């Protein structure tokens, strides 16, 4: 049997699409929009990224993917043919709403600069090619910039409400009081505290307590920051454990002390930073992890209309309400698919409730509704769920991460009671109010895309450290028992810092 010519096959395919009520959407390459931090040489990130909005020939933004195989392509190369550098450029991430996320990871610095071509077929998109004049530093270049210039380059927000709230309890920080109190109160054998000093942009630390292996996560983000920006001198304590530690009242005696944690709670005074989970995923994106704040955006499963109309949950048994979820699922399988994937806290329940198979996180988004229930503290999957395009049903919780304050119930997610007594009712509501549910899911996703951009996490870390340093009542010191945390060795990618240095004519 003779094969049909390719051109005829394409015509037939288009005819079928039109017949099915899905006319081809034509993309205008010159009218499409390209923007984002990855188009600026001075924005140094582990993975650089930028966005593309597909626009049609009439100037209208596309709100769904163009029909057929995505024809967008990105080519990143050195401006100088003499500079051969390793740059990993994966396929664009299709976010299924007419926008695309472009990523590239540099393994070496380019001195002369980069040329970034964004193509639709063979046609340049928007203002492509984009020229990034060098030097363009890779992640492991130790070339810290002036803080004001660095924040301006990253377009850091001038205010972060959660940071302002956290530091309202601490108009001044008494380092001497902390040196006396923290080891006694939190540094016992069961402790998980690391005492840091940053001096002259070098990181020093000593561990307090037995469970401090997670210092690798606080180390790596602090080192990444010091490679990019000049940090203020400061001395502080990081809590590596799950639970916030400082429960003293603001006006109480003795007064609370500012412990830095990855999770806050309504009854504690800890200063909150982005969790180790999203921070590590940002640092290791396109390398050591598969689920990260960028990759999730191109792996959100079927379109809304094709998702399974049930609420979904998979997770460990780290809170009793999760067991309740499984029981509800057994009784109401038409509304809820919930399973425990690993038993540790309630091992006696495994026989009764059963054990669910592990699922890839991207497969969660085959379902329209995602149930977010606390683990030991706030569930660290929540930012990833919000970046998907399912509706998130979030359990009321005393725990929070750094970005929760910006989210509103019924605008960005649907709240459910702590005891889950209204969960089934909320799932039924979502099924009966599909357009409203879809709208809330989209609003939540858009807000999460903004709040959880990797460069925003760097801004947040810097601003917490800056606010802390401003409040210190005495000079930080490298204390007995502290050791220097060295920068990782990267002999394959040596770089010289020469951005913004005065030329000979200016001297």
Curated annotation (Swiss-Prot):
Filamin repeat positions: 24-134
Coiled-coil region(s): none
Matches recorded under PROSITE patterns: ER_TARGET, FILAMIN_REPEAT
E.C. no: 2.4.1.-, 2.4.2.-
Pathways involved: Protein modification; protein glycosylation
A Pfam family this chain is assigned to: Glyco_transf_90
Reactions that this protein is recorded to catalyse: L-seryl-[EGF-like domain protein] + UDP-alpha-D-glucose = 3-O-(beta-D-glucosyl)-L-seryl-[EGF-like domain protein] + UDP + H(+); L-seryl-[EGF-like domain protein] + UDP-alpha-D-xylose = 3-O-(beta-D-xylosyl)-L-seryl-[EGF-like domain protein] + UDP + H(+)
Superkingdom of this protein's organism: Eukaryota
Main location, first listed in the record: endoplasmic reticulum
Signal sequence residues: 1-20
Gene3D superfamilies: Immunoglobulins
Span of the annotated motif Prevents secretion from ER: 504-507
Similarity remark: Belongs to the KDELC family.
Name of the protein described by the UniProt record: Protein O-glucosyltransferase 3
Top-level taxonomy: Eukaryota, Metazoa, Chordata, Craniata, Vertebrata
Encoding gene per record: POGLUT3
């Amino acid at each position: 049997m003779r094969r049909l010519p390719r051109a005829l096959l394409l015509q037939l395919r288009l005819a079928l699409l039109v017949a099915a009520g899905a006319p081809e959407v034509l993309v205008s390459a010159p009218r499409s929009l390209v923007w984002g931090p990855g188009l600026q040489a001075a924005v140094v990130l582990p993975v650089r990224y930028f966005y593309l909005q597909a626009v049609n020939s009439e100037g209208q933004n596309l709100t769904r993917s163009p029909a057929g195989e995505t024809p967008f392509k990105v080519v990143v190369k050195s401006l100088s043919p003499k500079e051969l550098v390793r740059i990993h450029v994966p396929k664009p991430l299709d976010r299924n709403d007419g926008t695309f996320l472009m990523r590239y990871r540099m393994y070496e610095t380019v001195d002369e600069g980069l040329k970034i071509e964004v193509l639709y077929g063979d046609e340049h998109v928007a203002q492509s090619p984009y020229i990034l004049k060098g030097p363009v530093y890779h992640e492991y270049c130790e070339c810290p910039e002036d803080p004001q210039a660095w924040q301006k380059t990253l377009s850091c927000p001038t205010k972060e409400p959660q940071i302002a709230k956290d530091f309202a309890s601490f108009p001044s920080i008494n380092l001497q009081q902390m040196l006396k109190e923290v080891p006694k109160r939190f540094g016992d054998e069961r402790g998980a505290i690391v005492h840091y000093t940053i001096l002259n942009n070098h990181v020093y630390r000593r561990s307090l307590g037995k469970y401090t292996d997670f210092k690798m996560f606080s180390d790596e983000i602090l080192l990444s920051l010091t490679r990019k920006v000049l940090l203020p001198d400061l001395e502080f304590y990081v809590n590596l454990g799950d639970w916030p530690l400082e429960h003293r009242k603001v006006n109480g005696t003795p007064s609370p002390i500012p412990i830095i944690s990855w999770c806050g709670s309504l009854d504690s005074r800890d200063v909150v930073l982005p969790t180790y989970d999203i921070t590590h995923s940002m640092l290791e994106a396109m390398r050591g992890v598969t689920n990260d704040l960028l990759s999730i955006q191109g792996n959100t499963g079927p379109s809304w209309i094709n998702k399974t109309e049930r609420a979904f949950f998979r997770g460990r048994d780290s809170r009793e309400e999760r067991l309740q979820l499984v029981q509800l699922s057994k009784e109401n399988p038409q509304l809820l698919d919930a399973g425990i994937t690993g038993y540790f806290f309630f091992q006696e329940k495994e026989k009764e409730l059963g054990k669910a198979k592990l699922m890839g996180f991207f497969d969660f988004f085959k379902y329209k509704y995602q149930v977010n229930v606390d683990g030991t503290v706030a569930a660290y999957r929540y930012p990833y769920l919000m970046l998907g395009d399912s509706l998130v049903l979030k359990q009321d919780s005393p725990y929070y991460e750094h970005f929760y304050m910006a989210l509103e119930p019924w605008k960005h997610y649907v709240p459910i009671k702590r005891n889950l007594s209204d969960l089934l009712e909320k799932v039924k509501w979502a099924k009966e109010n599909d357009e409203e549910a879809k709208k809330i899911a989209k609003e939540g996703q858009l807000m999460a895309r903004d709040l959880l951009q990797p460069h925003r996490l760097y801004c947040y870390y810097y601003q917490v450290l800056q606010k802390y340093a401003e409040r210190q009542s005495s000079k930080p010191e490298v204390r007995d028992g502290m050791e220097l945390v060295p920068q990782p060795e990267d002999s394959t990618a040596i770089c010289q810092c020469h951005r913004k240095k005065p030329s000979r004519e200016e001297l």
